[in-house]
């Protein structure tokens, strides 16, 4: 069997070239504060891949996506090893657009910090009197530039996103910026409405898009996972403070309260983190993870 090497390795994913397609492996690595931790979180990669598959299937009436298959039998022999099962996706090749498409339905995190200062989030003025974790009257689109690994993404205004896209696609900056904004909000609205019926609030999330060979907009990367989104339990939701969440907040909190930790988590924190990921997956999909 031929040993294959990834053509690109991110903090969590490995990308392999498969001729006319790509193969994307979500590893069990976990990153916090842009640092890859020494621990691996068993089943995390499978949660990311299978949850993305669920959302891709749910939203294909709104926009096509890059997923071809998550069945390793459809892939080269190298990916039929046990270690790739459940966490591997064969995808269409896309020309990725240089914008991270962030949508916020609730005010929290960096958005809340910004609002407290001047009543705006990423340059968008919001109503007075909002409390932390309040639902916004309408979801807001707050794009950012895509940074190289090790750098931070930079929040930009909608107008700046037009200029940024214009550099890559002369004469099409506004058209693509509007398409990204409208698609992002439409996807968020459908998925947030669905998640609420399953007891989960999607406070905010991030999408990435690319163009196929015909120039059509296609959803790429991952979709609505605990790595790219804030999921809150609807039960007990109460504005006025932060909310418990189904993500790596356990890990972040432990690292913050234990300086000099060498970027290694105790097993108890690893176990709590994956329990949250699995709980979110099971609530949203209605089934146990098969991996």
PLM features: residue spans?
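Coil-to-beta-strand transition motifs
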Residues: 21, 96-98, 199-202, 214-217
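Active-site loop/lid in soluble adenylation, ligation, and acyl-transfer enzymes
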Residues: 1-148, 261-291
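Anionic ligand-binding catalytic core segments
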Residues: 117-118, 125-175, 219, 223-284
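Intrinsically disordered, low-complexity acidic/polar segments
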Residues: 33, 112-113, 214, 228-230
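A long amphipathic alpha-helix within ATP-dependent nucleotide-binding catalytic cores
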Residues: 171-203
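Conserved metal-phosphate-binding beta-hairpin within the catalytic cores
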Residues: 103, 202-223
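Generic recognition of stable, solvent-exposed alpha-helical segments in well-folded globular domains
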Residues: 46, 50, 175, 179-182, ...
């Amino acid at each position: 069997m031929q040993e294959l090497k990834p053509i690109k390795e991110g903090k969590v994913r490995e990308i392999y070239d498969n001729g006319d397609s790509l193969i994307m492996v979500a590893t069990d690595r976990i990153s916090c504060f842009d640092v890859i931790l020494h621990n691996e979180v068993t089943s995390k990669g499978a949660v990311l891949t299978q949850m993305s598959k669920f959302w891709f299937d749910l939203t294909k009436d709104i926009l096509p996506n890059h997923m071809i298959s998550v069945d390793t039998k459809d892939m080269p022999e190298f990916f039929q090893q046990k270690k790739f099962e459940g966490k591997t996706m064969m995808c269409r090749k896309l020309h990725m657009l240089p914008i991270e498409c962030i949508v916020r339905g609730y005010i929290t995190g960096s958005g809340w910090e910004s609002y407290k200062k001047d009543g705006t989030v990423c340059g968008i003025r919001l109503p007075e009197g909002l409390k932390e974790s309040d639902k916004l009257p309408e979801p807001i689109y707050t794009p950012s530039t895509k940074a190289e690994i090790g750098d931070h993404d930079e929040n930009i205004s909608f107008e700046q996103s037009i200029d940024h896209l214009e550099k890559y696609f002369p004469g099409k900056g506004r058209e693509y910026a509007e398409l990204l904004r409208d698609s992002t909000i439409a996807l968020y609205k459908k998925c947030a409405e669905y998640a609420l019926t399953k007891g989960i609030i999607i406070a905010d999330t991030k999408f990435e898009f690319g163009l196929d060979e015909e120039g059509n907009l296609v959803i790429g990367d991952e979709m609505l996972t605990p790595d790219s989104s804030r999921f809150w339990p609807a039960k007990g939701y109460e504005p006025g403070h932060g909310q418990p969440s189904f993500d790596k907040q356990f890990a972040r909190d432990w690292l913050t309260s234990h300086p000099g930790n060498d970027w290694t988590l105790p097993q108890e924190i690893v176990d709590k983190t994956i329990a949250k990921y699995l709980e979110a997956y099971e609530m949203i999909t209605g089934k146990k993870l098969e991996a």
